[in-house]
Amino acid sequence: MTQVVNVVGAGLAGSEAAYQLAQRGVKVNLIEMRPVKQTPAHHTDKFAELVCSNSLRGNALTNAVGVLKEEMRQLDSLIISAADKARVPAGGALAVDRHDFAGYVTETLKNHPNITVLNEEINSIPEGYTIIATGPLTTDKLANEIVEATGKDQLYFYDAAAPIIEKDSIDMNKVYLKSRYDKGEAAYLNCPMTEDEFNTFYDALMEAEVAPVNEFEKEKYFEGCMPFEVMAERGRKTLLFGPMKPVGLEDPKTGERPYAVVQLRQDDAAGTLYNIVGFQTHLKWGAQKDVIRLIPGLENVEIVRYGVMHRNTFINSPDVLTETYELKGREELYFAGQMTGVEGYVESAASGLVAGINVAHKMLNKGEVIFPRETMIGSMAYYISHAKNEKNFQPMNANFGLLTTLEKKVKDKKLRYEKLADRALTYLDNYKQTL
């Protein structure tokens, strides 16, 4: 077999994809523009450079990303192997010496007999089997090519994502199901507020701490939609005419209109996750939790993904990608990493792992590899290709809400997560036997 796969981008996803291909005997051109052309966020020419935190987050199996890491260990992940080798003390988290980590990944790939490294910028999608893993700072010229491949309006340039919460953690006695003016089916959960409750919420919001904005993100920051805390700064009642507007949302129990309403919209096909409508935000995560828990019905809510607003480049995956990260209608072109709508270091690497294995299988005339939805790696691939809210698709990190529910409901959260983790690893072990 002489055909070569092009992997564009040697970040976490591209590095993982190249390794998975090479380990299966497939020849790879790993194309990385650094150091020929640097990005505003990178500082070295190393592969898999961690540009923000040096933490890959929780390592325990009661943590969703911990389960994802363990699945990836079982699948011979280069990124997780590098992280384990470069680990530094960080309590229950897997944090790394970023130089040792990137150095290990770089040397492994540069010394692999099946990988050729090409340091050059490309402005068009290569012919033949290709995995695009160019990340949130994809160059404008390549982004235009991606638009050509995926279709108009399928590529986004920034995140403006509202928090996502677990349905099981909502106090259903305090909320009601209703659509504004009863139009269509009752699709939203509504959290009603009295005037006093709204004022308490508003005052806390005005005191809440905002996250700093990176220099390279400022240019794109306010395109499109505004953080709800910025909207609130315009006046105490501004939110009442925006995302917290109560008109047409009378409480069916009392027949009265609340002073304010926070709406929750289903976010996944299984109905286990809801997003807070219009609450795209740049508040720090701790501040988000404090403010959100002032909303009636959400006092004990579990937040599976916090709201974000930052520079990003990602495609509308549910419309254009399959569960193997392949572009629909163009069977030699795959995507991986943050560009696909996964959020986080580990999640990006996991998408590269799935894409890499699938391209290798296709070239070796083997079947598609679609991991079970009971696994974290499989549930993420399913989410990006089947998200319910595809018209407003936003990136997602690993969380237990993505997994199919247990046959028997378990009320205790820690025990439930343990059972989900155990089931995920069992399913993965069984599925591995078929590969």
Curated annotation (Swiss-Prot):
InterPro entries: FAD/NAD-bd_sf, MnmG-rel, MnmG-rel_CS, MnmG_N, TrmFO
Its EC number(s): 2.1.1.74
Disulphide bridges: none
PROSITE patterns associated with the record: GIDA_2
Keywords from the named record: Cytoplasm, FAD, Flavoprotein, Methyltransferase, NAD, NADP, Transferase, tRNA processing
GO biological process, one term: tRNA wobble uridine modification
Cofactor(s) the protein requires to work: FAD
GO terms assigned for molecular function: flavin adenine dinucleotide binding; tRNA (uracil(54)-C5)-methyltransferase activity, 5,10-methylenetetrahydrofolate-dependent
Pfam families: GIDA
PANTHER family attached to this UniProt entry: GLUCOSE INHIBITED DIVISION PROTEIN A, METHYLENETETRAHYDROFOLATE--TRNA-(URACIL-5-)-METHYLTRANSFERASE TRMFO
Function as written in the Swiss-Prot or TrEMBL entry: Catalyzes the folate-dependent formation of 5-methyl-uridine at position 54 (M-5-U54) in all tRNAs.
Full protein name: Methylenetetrahydrofolate--tRNA-(uracil-5-)-methyltransferase TrmFO
Species of the source: Staphylococcus saprophyticus subsp. saprophyticus (strain ATCC 15305 / DSM 20229 / NCIMB 8711 / NCTC 7292 / S-41)
Lineage of producing organism: Bacteria, Bacillati, Bacillota, Bacilli, Bacillales
